[in-house]
Design a protein with these regions (language model features):
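Active-site-proximal loop/helix of nucleotide/amide-processing enzymes and allied scaffolds
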Residues: 1-28, 36, 45-48, 70, ...
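Glycine-enriched loop-and-adjacent helix/strand subsegments that border the catalytic/binding cleft
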Residues: 29-72
Length: 173
C-alpha cells in the first residue's frame, strides 16, 4: 500500500499520480496481493502482471482492471466466479467499476480458463465484441480482453488484431 505522510496531507499537498514499484490490492476473498505498477499497455506485461491474480483457480474468474491515463493499474475488481468451464457477466457490471474508481480512463478485462488452454471460445469472442461496442459508446477505451491459461500462456484479443477489427471504425486503443 502506498503511504503518504500525514503531515504532507495537512500541508495541503495534492497528489496527482503515484509511480511506485508495487500496489497492494485485496482480492475478492480478502487476501492481500501485491502487483507491479507497470503500464499495462503491452499484452505481455498485462498478462504477466494480472495472470497471478487468477492463478490456481479451479473455476473461471472474470475481472476488470481500471487503468490510469498511463495505463497503470488503479483498481482490480473480480466480477464473477463461475464453473470450471464458464462464467456469466452482465455488460453494466463491467463498466460500474470505472465509475467507482476515480481517474479511470481505460479498462482491461481478463478471465482465466481453468483447463489451462487460453484459446478463446465463440462466447468469449461474442462477449469481447459486445464489450468493445459498449466501451466505444461510453468513450471509455477497452484496452484489451485477456484470457489466461497455465504456464504463462495467454490470449490477447488486441494482440490477435480482433479487438479493433470487430467494430466498424475501430475501438480506440
Amino acid at each position: 500500500m502506498l503511504h503518504i505522510p500525514h503531515d504532507s496531507l495537512q500541508r495541503g499537498h495534492r497528489v496527482r499520480e503515484f509511480v511506485c514499484t508495487y500496489r497492494t490490492l485485496r482480492d475478492d476473498q480478502g487476501q492481500t496481493v501485491r502487483v507491479p505498477t507497470l503500464a499495462l499497455s503491452d499484452p505481455r506485461i498485462a498478462a504477466a502482471t494480472l495472470a497471478p491474480l487468477l492463478a490456481n483457480e479451479a473455476v473461471e474468474i472474470f475481472a476488470v482492471a481500471c487503468l490510469s491515463t498511463k495505463h497503470r493499474l488503479l483498481a482490480w475488481y473480480v466480477l464473477s466466479r463461475g464453473t470450471r468451464s464458464s462464467t456469466s457477466i452482465s455488460l453494466p457490471d463491467v463498466f460500474v467499476p470505472a465509475c467507482l474508481t476515480p481517474g479511470t480512463t481505460a479498462l482491461l478485462v481478463v478471465h482465466n480458463h481453468p483447463s489451462g488452454d487460453p484459446t478463446p471460445s465463440p462466447e468469449d469472442a461474442r462477449l469481447t465484441l459486445r464489450l468493445a461496442q459498449a466501451a466505444d459508446v461510453l468513450d471509455l477505451p477497452l484496452l484489451d480482453h485477456l484470457i489466461v491459461g497455465d504456464g504463462g500462456r495467454y490470449f490477447s484479443f488486441r494482440e490477435a488484431g480482433t479487438l479493433t477489427a470487430q467494430i466498424a471504425g475501430g475501438v480506440r486503443v
